[in-house]
Curated annotation (Swiss-Prot):
PANTHER family: SPINDLE AND KINETOCHORE-ASSOCIATED PROTEIN 3. Component of the SKA complex, composed of ska1, ska2 and ska3. CDD domains: SKA3_N. Its main location: cytoplasm. GO terms for cellular component: cytoplasm; kinetochore; meiotic spindle; mitotic spindle; outer kinetochore; spindle microtubule. The lineage of its organism: Eukaryota, Metazoa, Chordata, Craniata, Vertebrata. This is SKA complex subunit 3.
């Protein structure tokens, strides 16, 4: 049912309802004077009628709006379909034109030819049917007239040959009688009747065939290539170019072992003067050279403050002519890690000892002056050992007549010292341990500004027996500079 028909049917019902209500309202309006109740009922009915009419109007408006939207959607859909149809027809025409270049015949022409043929066949069939009807009518008439005549049986043209279902199938049953197949064993049979020429021209098989037993074919086997084979998992044995040098075992170390050195040679190596701290390159070369399995010895470290247990060696640094005396003091490789007492006694160290021990120190000092003082040989670079070093010149007596020329001292303590300035003072000859005599030059020392004079004496190092409760360790650079100043004085006295 169309929406327009539904709309008009509802409208007709509404008009009928309005007419009935209007008639009832007219009737009630004419009879207003009858009862007050009738007036109230009439007003209520009118109000209900107005409300119903308003509701119907709203409903009609909604239906019209929905009908308009649906019709608009339908129109847009139809337009889209028409546009799509036009596009498809254009595409089909372009494809037909493209395929016609390659011999394509459109379907319309084929349908036209088939329709023409069909119409011709239909006309012929209609004519045949009409002829058959005429013949049937004539036959009926003849049958009615000749009822007494014996019906002659019509024999069939040809009876189909009987078919044996259990017969073995032949090539002719499958339409393959025209083809000639070669037998695997034996001679080929010559066909009795010449077969009709077929479209496929096949060469006739030879009459005499080589009677050889059929050989079994070699089975096809896929060749396994080395490239396709799975590669075995590589095992890491830890051998590489970097780790080849680690494979030197203990036996090779025994072959490369060198004979142990004598104690004198070791002392030479120990006392050999270095440039106080050895360079990294020399340390590396030394490590490479000491790969032989010698008896275990404590290694030599250049790091100050690292404690190791090693043999006691003289803590006095060796004097090297190549070293610059103006350079800051350095530590020797043979210097122990813990700070030791200086090799020579100075007045500054005596202040660190308590007053109770000064008497004992004076006795030890007087005894030590009588003993000889030995210094290491300055030519240790030429390969001489510590035992061949000359002895320290022995001080016979201390005269105040003459003093040696005071050199430029490096330590703070040495720079603060002052010496007595006497023009006629001189030192007597000092007898060495080897029997040689060493002469000191008669020089004058300038008097410092503060006017403080103090005697300078060379003595053997004293042994500290008692220490204070909390002894303060002197700074290593100051003590080493003091010893360096003493070495300067000794070198000046010798040369």
């Amino acid at each position: 049912m169309n929406p327009s028909e539904r709309f008009f049917s509802k409208l007709r019902k509404l008009t009928v309802y309005l007419e009935t209500e209007s008639s009832s309202l007219l009737h009630t309006s004419q009879n207003l004077k009858e009862d007050e109740e009738d007036e109230e009922t009439g007003a209520q009915a009118l109000y209900q009628l107005h409300s119903e009419v308003r509701a119907l109007k709203r409903q009609v408006r909604d239906q019209v709006a929905t009908h308009d939207t649906s019709s608009a959607d339908l129109r847009s859909f139809i337009r889209r379909c028409l546009v799509l149809k036009q596009r498809t027809t254009e595409d089909i025409d372009s494809l037909k034109k493209h395929y016609e270049k390659y011999g394509y015949r459109p379907r319309i022409s084929r349908l036209g030819s088939t329709e023409v043929n069909c119409t011709k066949e239909a006309e012929e069939r209609a004519e045949r049917d009409a002829e058959k009807l005429d013949a049937a009518e004539e036959d009926e008439e003849t049958e009615r007239g000749d009822c007494d005549k014996v019906d002659q049986s019509v024999t069939p043209e040809k009876m189909p040959p009987p078919v044996d279902q259990l017969q073995t199938p032949k090539l002719s049953d499958f339409g393959l009688s025209a083809l000639q197949f070669q037998r695997v064993l034996g001679e080929a049979e010559v066909p009795l009747s010449a077969a009709p020429e077929s479209a496929i021209a096949l060469s006739s098989p030879p009459i005499l065939m080589n009677l050889q037993p059929p050989q079994p074919k070699t089975p096809k086997c896929s060749l396994s290539m080395e490239e396709d084979a799975l590669t075995p998992r590589l095992e890491d044995f830890g051998i590489s170019e970097y780790t080849m040098c680690w494979n030197n075992d203990f036996t090779m170390d025994l072959f490369n072992k060198k004979p142990p050195k004598n104690r004198s040679e070791r002392n030479e190596n120990v006392l050999k003067p270095h440039n106080v701290f050895s360079n990294t390159s020399s340390v590396l070369n030394k490590d490479v050279a000491n790969k032989s399995l010698e008896s275990p010895e404590p290694p030599e470290f250049c790091t100050p403050g690292f404690k190791i247990a090693k043999n006691h060696v003289p803590s006095t640094p060796l004097f090297n002519g190549k070293n610059d005396l103006n350079s800051p003091p350095r530590l020797n490789n043979n210097c122990p890690s813990t700070p030791e007492l200086p090799a020579f006694e100075t007045p500054f160290v005596s202040k660190l000892i308590k007053k109770e021990d000064r008497e004992e120190e004076s006795k030890i000092h007087s005894e030590s002056q009588e003993n000889s003082l030995r210094l290491p040989d300055l030519s240790t670079t030429n390969g001489t050992s510590w035992n061949d070093a000359p002895e320290m010149p022995k001080m016979l007596r201390y005269e105040e007549e003459a003093l040696p020329e005071m050199p430029i001292l490096q330590s703070n303590f040495g720079s603060s010292l002052a010496f007595k300035n006497t023009s006629g003072e001189s030192l007597s000859r000092m007898k060495t341990g080897a029997g040689h005599m060493l002469e000191m030059k008669q020089t004058s020392v300038p008097v410092p500004e503060d006017g403080f004079n103090q005697d300078w004496c060379l003595s053997t190092p004293k042994v500290r027996v008692k220490f204070p409760a909390e002894p303060c360790t002197p700074e290593m650079p100051d003590m080493s500079s003091v010893t360096q100043d003493i070495l300067k004085l000794v070198a000046q006295c010798k040369y």
